[in-house]
């Protein structure tokens, strides 16, 4: 009979222990709450950041244009120099030579510019 009471005690304690564990676990689960804030992105802070970004973009625009124009100008100058050298070297005028320092095609006898 003692054996029977011990097994019935175990059978009663297992569900009771599960209830106690779940009760202890519940406040911890309730304490961990999540807040979700839905924002359309039209807050004053985001508008100010967008305005500042646009202002910075506009202020650097003229500088970017100047840099791009300078790069294009240097490229055109180099391209013109290369084309002139090729024309001068391919010229049938035997007295024509290319001077690198001035980027011009000159006559050997007179030193004047020659049109190749």
Curated annotation (Swiss-Prot):
Q: Which InterPro entries match?
A: DUF1283
Pfam families to which the protein is assigned, alphabetical:
DUF1283
Superkingdom as given in the UniProt entry: Bacteria
As given in the record, the signal peptide range reads 1-31
Question: Which key words tag this protein in UniProt?
Answer: Signal
HAMAP family, per the entry: UPF0482
Family assignment from sequence similarity: Belongs to the UPF0482 family.
The name on file for this protein is UPF0482 protein ECA2253
Q: Which organism is it from?
A: Pectobacterium atrosepticum (strain SCRI 1043 / ATCC BAA-672) (Erwinia carotovora subsp. atroseptica)
Q: What is the lineage of its organism?
A: Bacteria, Pseudomonadati, Pseudomonadota, Gammaproteobacteria, Enterobacterales
């Amino acid at each position: 009979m003692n054996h029977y009471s011990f097994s019935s005690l175990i059978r009663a304690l297992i569900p009771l222990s599960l209830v106690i564990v779940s009760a202890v676990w519940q406040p911890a689960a309730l304490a961990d709450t999540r807040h979700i804030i839905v924002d359309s992105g039209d807050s004053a802070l985001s508008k100010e950041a967008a305005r500042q970004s646009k202002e910075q973009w506009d202020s650097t625009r003229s500088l970017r244009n100047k840099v791009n124009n300078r790069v294009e100008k240097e490229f055109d100058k180099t391209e013109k120099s290369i084309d002139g050298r090729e024309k001068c070297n391919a010229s049938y005028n035997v007295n024509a030579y290319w001077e690198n320092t001035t980027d011009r095609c000159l006559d050997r006898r007179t030193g004047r510019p020659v049109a190749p």
